[in-house]
Amino acid sequence: MNKRYFLAFDLGASSGRAILGTLNNNQLELTEIHRFANQMQLISGHYFWNIFSLFNELKTGLKKCVKEFGIQPESIGVDTWGVDFVHLNKEGLIISLPFAYRDSRTNTSMDDLFQIAPQEDVYAQTGIQFMQFNSLFQLFSMVKDQSSLMEITDSILFMPDALNYLFSGVKKSEFSIASTSQMIVPGTCQWNYELVEKAGIPRQILQEIILPGTILGNITEEVASETGSKTIPVIAVAGHDTASAIVSVPCCLNNFAYISSGTWSLMGIECRNPHISEQTRQLNFTNEGGVGGTTRFLKNIMGMWLIQEVQRIWEEEGMSYTWPAMVELARRSEPFQFLINPDDSMFLNPRDMTQAIRDFCYQTAQGTPQTHGEVIRCIYDSLALKYRFTLEQIRDVSDQPIEVIHIIGGGANNHFLNQLTADATGLNIVAGPTEATAIGNIMIQAKTLGYVGSLTEIRQIVADSSELVRFVPSDELDWDEAYNRYLRVTL
């Protein structure tokens, strides 16, 4: 096979990248073309994303690829975080910055909607984990508040769909990102119009759902001219970053659980059909769309967000730590002294994460962590124990064997947390690839254009092209006692 080039745009809640993938003789090489910061913008008391700035950064990435690297990619694809969306008017113009999912306007939306549509019914109809920022609740909050923005909204597009639209001029909703909305019929490409209309959301604002691996069209003449590009297809990859990441799990057997570790930790299994029952509702599991007819049965766990936030607060206070330095502080601190529930709502978007952690520990009669090392150790111990808790829940509701955990994404670089996770769960850990989302994005493009044949073939290429690190459980610490303490303070 001659070298084939694909450009992935991978946007996260804190940064975005343009990554060039070179596929050559079943080996994949990655080159970072462009990197930029992303953060929520606080404007008039609400949090927004600056989609116009983000699109400019993506165009810069394409321009660099063409002009600085001298490469015309065969295609481009975009993935982002889930649930957030853009409003367009009837002329097809974006009429507002999109709200960010951590905005407080949805704080009461779940309970308010349950007065109209009972929680049990909503879960049975969608199979999606209840989180106050799901698109369903964001839209319902706007309907409930009689938002003037809704009155002039002709269509909505989720973040990757909106960026695809800006590139191609084509409005579609890709399956994996649409599934995060809590508004589709499980395992299908159909909107749940019964639920949508019960929530008062105008059904006509929703776009046709397409499967990942659909060619939307070519970049517009305007984009081509601005970036110096030739005609390039825009492919709707798995627009939800986690869905793209799971594609790159380097395992060809169906005996694994995964943790896609970044700002969020997404932990689950890949299955053919949704798991929807009263038990999965009570455990608050989600069934999101995957690639190749798969369902991502998983739970969203607050992940590196906790570390990112304490790091940010301490930097504002004049103490700047690198990630390795923070790990070393944790390593030197006493294990299991303080434990938190990472998913407690008080950690969603506090003004001071360090104080929020101290408050939780105080309220659960543990005392309070004083040193930075104690705070960091508390976070890492608690995440590892949360992974064990989630693993046991998955095993309770599914008979799918789990013999290994694959940790992918940026968190795969955290060898300290990986070892804690192996110790806590008693399972072998395989860490890598770290650029899982970009790899999945790229390989879906390659499959769409006929250069790769199947999901299994993709995963073999990833395994052959990646440096993987393995972690084996140790019994140096009493994790069973720690787990029992964790249950006492978090349940």
Language model features: what each stretch is:
Residues 79-83, 212-213, 261-264, 404-412:
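Glycine-rich beta-strand-to-loop/alpha-helix junction loops that act as flexible
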Residues 200-212:
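A conserved helix-loop-beta module that forms one wall/lid of the active-site cleft
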Residues 63, 67-101, 129-133, 164-185, ...:
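Short beta-strand-loop/turn "lid" adjacent to the catalytic site in phosphate-handling enzymes
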Residues 2, 7-8, 20, 107, ...:
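Active-site core segments that coordinate phosphate-bearing ligands/cofactors
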Residues 47-55, 128, 132, 209-213, ...:
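Short acidic-aromatic active-site loops that bind/stabilize oxyanions
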Residues 1-96, 124, 224-234, 425-427:
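N-terminal glycine/serine-rich phosphate-binding loop of ATP-dependent small-molecule kinases
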Residues 72-80, 155, 208, 400-409:
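Short glycine-rich phosphate-binding loop at a beta-alpha junction
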Residues 44-48, 119-129, 205:
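Short glycine/proline- and acidic residue-enriched helix-loop micro-motifs
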